Amino acid sequence: MDQLVSAAYATEISLARTAFQNGDYSKCFYHLERAHILGQRSTVKHTYAHWLMFRVGVQQSDFREILGQVPRMLASLLFSRIWVPVGNTGRSRVPAMKVMPIPDDLRHLLQ
């Protein structure tokens, strides 16, 4: 994975952790979604983003998020190196296989 993408991923994870610690779960998910987009091509980073989404779901008692993240974690372990739905934010509220637009400020990192 490109160093710029890895650095941007690490920044998003750090911001998500800070938001989680502050109880700002909406902001936490925002940064986790961005980390997910950046980390999709790395099995470890992709799965870790889903793991953190799962943890936020547990913290919020959001059963839809919890149940949706389990198969996404498994799929990320199996398919990250083969195919990913580019731009997909990784949340349980969006279809797992849906290709989505990449945010403008991240697009240059992934091209």
Tell me what each language-model feature is.
Residues 38-39, 77-81:
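Alpha-helical junction/boundary sensor with strong preference for TPR arrays
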Residues 25-28, 35, 65-66:
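Solenoid-repeat scaffolds in large eukaryotic assemblies
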Residues 2, 6-10, 47:
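Start-of-helix signal in alpha-solenoid helical-repeat scaffolds, especially tetratricopeptide repeats
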Residues 54-79:
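TPR/TPR-like (Sel1-like) alpha-helical repeat modules
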Residues 20, 32-33, 39, 70:
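Inward-facing hydrophobic residues that define packing positions of alpha-helical scaffold repeats
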Residues 4, 24, 41-42:
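Short coil/turn linker motifs that delimit alpha-helical repeat modules in TPR/alpha-solenoid proteins
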